[in-house]
Regions:
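Hydrophobic alpha-helical segments within soluble ligand-binding/sensing domains
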Residues: 156-181, 196, 200, 221-230, ...
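Short, solvent-exposed amphipathic alpha-helices that sit
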Residues: 35, 73-87, 163-170, 189-208, ...
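Flexible loop/turn connectors
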Residues: 229-240, 244-322
Length: 322
């Protein structure tokens, strides 16, 4: 585990200079700042953001890393964390990663450098090993929608596989046998888990899995619309569609409407997440509820408590969608 002395030695500066760089002091030259940052990157040194934040009582901040704050799902998550931050006298800093490993890493590092008292992280592309390294150095780092081995007590996750199984079972119970699945094209854990949940439900009911009915698309309205167009172009008759999330379901409804297909009389559609958009769709969308507000609230409270060395509040480490 690298120390501040190791950084100073590699950068060719004093420990005091490294400390000034970490605290964004104006009394450092640009050459020193670059040398220190290069050494930190090479050594994978992550200063203990929690200890630094506690030494700056007037600068209490909470950080969150999300995929894309402009989407309804992540917008709800950020708002829930922000409400906890405000209630506890913290200011919220947000980092977007766009489901890219390099940007996830950079977002976490930037929040650490900004002396966050705790960090809630939604990161699907970084490896378990890299996240374990971060969590070992940052006691106030909490994962959401992912479980990192060895740090299960600091992870707030959802049973995505069960949720997709629940959605598929809902259509099967309505009598559907030819059911398509609109899958996320992002290579992330919950995309695989939800697709597997769909497969599980079909298998349990003796329905053959037709890979041609699993259509990938970006997890948004455009992706859902294009996926349904691709499905219709196959000429295969389906009576039900399970969607990776609600935005894809919204796009699916639009494409079906454009092609004169009535929902739910001709085809049934079910989403996943239960975000605000579902309240304004016509016809109304049946969806699986993702308790994102509860999960984000618990994650934020846990991060703050751990950052300050306080007893961890009671949390649910694995939520069950309904």
């Amino acid at each position: 585990m690298a120390t501040i002395k190791d950084v100073a030695r590699l950068a060719g500066v004093s420990v005091a200079t490294v400390s000034r760089v970490l605290n964004s002091s104006p009394k450092t030259s640009s050459e020193s700042r670059e040398a220190v940052k290069k050494a930190m990157d090479e050594l994978k040194y992550h200063p203990n953001a929690n200890a630094r934040a506690l030494s700056h009582q007037g600068n209490e901040t909470l950080g969150i890393v999300v995929g894309d704050v402009s989407t309804p799902f992540f917008g709800i998550m950020v708002k829930a964390v922000d409400q906890v931050a405000y209630a506890t006298g913290n200011f919220l800093l947000v980092g977007n990663s766009y489901h890219d490993a390099k940007r996830e890493r950079k977002a976490i590092e930037q929040l650490l450098r900004h002396q966050c008292a705790g960090i809630v992280v939604h990161a699907m592309m970084l490896s378990d090993e890299e996240l374990q390294h971060f969590m070992a150095h940052v006691p106030g780092m909490v994962m959401i929608n992912r479980t990192v081995p060895g740090y299960e007590s600091r992870c707030i996750n959802l049973d995505n596989r069960f949720g997709a199984e629940l959605a598929t079972n809902h259509l099967i119970q309505q009598g559907h046998r030819s059911i398509a699945y609109l899958s996320s094209s992002y290579q992330i854990a919950d995309a695989f888990e939800r697709q597997q949940g769909y497969i599980d439900a079909l298998t349990q009911h003796g329905i053959p899995v037709d890979e041609r009915l699993i259509i990938q698309g970006t997890p948004d309205e455009i992706g859902g619309e294009r996926a349904v167009v691709g499905l219709l172009n196959q000429g295969r008759k389906v009576t039900g569609i399970v969607c990776y999330n609600d935005p894809m379901a919204a796009g699916a409804l639009s494409a079906l409407s454009d092609n004169g297909i009535q929902v739910p009389t001709q085809i049934s559609v079910i989403g996943f997440d239960d975000v605000l958009i579902t309240n304004y769709l016509q016809p109304h969308l049946t969806t699986i509820r993702y308790p994102v507000i509860e999960m984000a609230t618990q994650a934020a409270r846990l991060a703050i408590a751990l950052a300050h060395g306080e007893p961890a509040p009671d949390v649910t480490n694995l939520f069950i969608p309904t």
